[in-house]
Swiss-Prot record:
Mg(2+) 1 binds at residues 8, 139. CDD domains: RuvC (cd16962). Its main location: cytoplasm. The gene is ruvC. It catalyses: Endonucleolytic cleavage at a junction such as a reciprocal single-stranded crossover between two homologous DNA duplexes (Holliday junction). Its EC number is 3.1.21.10. It is found in: Cytoplasm. This is Crossover junction endodeoxyribonuclease RuvC.
Length: 173
């Protein structure tokens, strides 16, 4: 059994999702958003760090999975996203959680079946896979999808010494 915390980083809204994996069964434990309403970037980063730390303390996850930075059209947006990711990652590392990163396309491919999926498709599939009564809000659904991706890929992956990764089917990664 493992508990996985997924994070969809953002400088204004950071989504989180927590699931438990037992074999192939995934169970929803919680999700939501850390909202930063201040304009001051250092204060936003502090709020993200504190929020992620609180979530880790509450749910005691075994793994931390986060979305990688994508190249935005606006370089300023990409920099802010990178800073938000950094605040969340530092919270995880400070609490000794192993960190895994996944590209948005890889998450969509794993959860929906196509890397070009729309947000509504991700929400629908997360709802279906976790047997939720309603679609989660978009940022929380993305975070849950990241956690689901981690569970799916970790089932097919063996960890070797020196952090080398080899897929169970024999393909080097």
């Amino acid at each position: 059994m493992a508990i996985v915390l997924g994070i969809d980083p953002g400088s204004r809204v950071t989504g989180y999702g927590v699931i438990r994996q037992q074999g192939r069964q995934l169970t929803y434990l919680g999700s939501g958003c850390i909202r930063t309403v201040v304009d001051d970037m250092p204060t936003r980063l502090k709020l993200i760090y504190a929020g992620v730390t609180e979530i880790i303390t509450q749910f005691q996850p075994d793994f931390f999975a986060i979305e990688q930075v994508f190249m935005a059209k606006n370089p300023d947006s990409a920099l802010k996203l990178g800073q938000a990711r950094g605040a969340a990652i530092v919270a995880a590392v400070n609490l000794n959680l192993p960190v895994s990163e996944y590209a948005a396309r890889q998450v969509k491919q794993t959860v929906v079946g196509t890397g070009a999926a729309e947000k509504s498709q991700v929400q629908h599939m997360v709802r279906s896979l976790l047997q939720l009564p309603a679609n989660p809000q978009a940022d929380a659904a993305d975070a849950l999808a990241i956690a689901i991706t981690h569970c799916h890929l970790s089932q097919n992956t063996l960890r070797l010494g020196n952090d080398q990764m080899v897929l169970a089917r024999g393909r080097l990664r």
